[in-house]
């Protein structure tokens, strides 16, 4: 699964996903992309499931760029543990996705194939998304 090789801090503060994206708002690498219409924390399993769905549909033709990466550790305390006594242990890795972020890009396939591949990826993600073309968004 996706996770950073090393981090400066083991247990970071929770970064907000509210508001609009500052970067990654335009398609830079491919011809088509998947844009987030909401903000959310997307974990490494969801990103990997979306990537696998796209590659299987495209039958390994074309090229896929993942523009998000799960850099942030999410912590959780065990069940039935009293409040206090410190922050919980790292549970999973998440990417902070804000509204307007381009999450995936696709190239070297026709529009119909790219649209369907990105639609399949959309269903693996916990937020609303839309298909965009280069120069259109």
UniProtKB/Swiss-Prot annotation:
GO terms for molecular function: rRNA binding; structural constituent of ribosome; tRNA binding. InterPro entries: Ribosomal_uL16, Ribosomal_uL16_bact-type, Ribosomal_uL16_CS, Ribosomal_uL16_dom, Ribosomal_uL16_sf. SUPFAM superfamilies: Ribosomal protein L16p/L10e. The keyword Secreted does not apply. Keywords: Ribonucleoprotein, Ribosomal protein, RNA-binding, rRNA-binding, tRNA-binding. It comes from the Bacteria. Gene3D superfamilies: Ribosomal protein L10e/L16. One of its GO terms (biological process) is translation. The keyword NAD does not apply. One of its GO terms (cellular component) is cytosolic large ribosomal subunit. Part of the 50S ribosomal subunit. Belongs to the universal ribosomal protein uL16 family. Binds 23S rRNA and is also seen to make contacts with the A and possibly P site tRNAs. This is Large ribosomal subunit protein uL16.
């Amino acid at each position: 699964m996706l996770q950073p090789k090393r981090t400066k801090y083991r247990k970071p503060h929770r970064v907000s996903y509210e508001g609009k994206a500052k970067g990654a708002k335009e398609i830079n690498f491919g011809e088509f992309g998947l844009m987030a219409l909401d903000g959310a924390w997307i974990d490494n399993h969801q990103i990997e499931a979306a990537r696998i769905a796209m590659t299987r549909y495209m039958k390994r033709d074309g090229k896929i760029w993942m523009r998000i990466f799960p850099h942030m550790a999410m912590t959780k305390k065990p069940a039935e543990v009293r409040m206090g006594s410190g922050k919980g242990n790292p549970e999973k890795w998440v990417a902070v996705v804000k509204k307007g972020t381009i999450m995936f890009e696709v190239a070297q396939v026709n529009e119909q194939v790219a649209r369907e591949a990105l639609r399949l990826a959309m269903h693996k993600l916990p937020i609303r998304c839309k298909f965009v073309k280069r120069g259109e968004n």
